[in-house]
Structure formats: structure tokens, C-alpha cells
Amino acid sequence: MARVKRGVIARKRHKKILKLAKGYYGARSRVFRVAKQAVIKAGQYAYRDRRQKKRQFRALWIARINAGARTNGLSYSRLIAGLKKASIEIDRKVLADLAVNEKAAFAAIVEKAKAVLA
């Protein structure tokens, strides 16, 4: 059986990692050993943050809805309770957008929630 030298395979593997590490600072983009660690860590951060992004956006939407609700004389929790009682099914993303960009429409929704709560 012929002896197999791994030069081609090793070069391909190294090129793949260094391509993924392109744009990293210093040795992280040039030295294979360091680049491999950086790419693995970047993958871990990306995996974690894809999940955190959902939580962070929900928190942002809630903060915006709360600010909009309080300008209309209602707290966030009371607004959500009022919307549930009035069977108005608008998700937080849309509510937050209305609170920021369409203040009149948001105020109308808050008034409906207030009417049900009173």
C-alpha cells in the first residue's frame, strides 16, 4: 500500500479555517492555530446570540410599549391586560412600532384597552 502524504488535505483544511477568520485582528487571521480557536469561539458566540437576540428584541418592544402606554396614562401590564380583555390580538412587535411611529393609532388602541378596564 502506498504511503499517503496529507499535504493536500491539510492545506485545504487550513485554507478553510483561514477563510472563515478573514478580517480578524492580528494573528487571529494569519496563524492557523490561533485562527481555529477564534473561529470556534465566534461560532459559539453566534449560536448563543441568535437566541439572545429574540429576548433582547422582546425586551426592547416592551420598553417602547411601556413608554407609549405611560404617555397615555396606563402602565404596560394594565395595557396588556386590557387588550386581552378586549380580545385585541396585536403582537408586541407591531404595538411597539405603533407606539414609536403611529402615536395616534397607538393612543386609539390604548383608549379601547382603558374602556374595557374601566
UniProtKB/Swiss-Prot annotation:
Keyword presence, Ribosomal protein: yes
One GO CC annotation: ribosome
Gene responsible for this protein: rplT
PANTHER family, A to Z: 39S RIBOSOMAL PROTEIN L20 (PTHR10986)
Stated name of the protein: Large ribosomal subunit protein bL20
Family statement: Belongs to the bacterial ribosomal protein bL20 family.
Single annotated GO MF: structural constituent of ribosome
Function: Binds directly to 23S ribosomal RNA and is necessary for the in vitro assembly process of the 50S ribosomal subunit. It is not involved in the protein synthesizing functions of that subunit.
SUPFAM superfamilies: Ribosomal protein L20
Keywords: Ribonucleoprotein, Ribosomal protein, RNA-binding, rRNA-binding
Biological processes per GO annotation: ribosomal large subunit assembly; translation
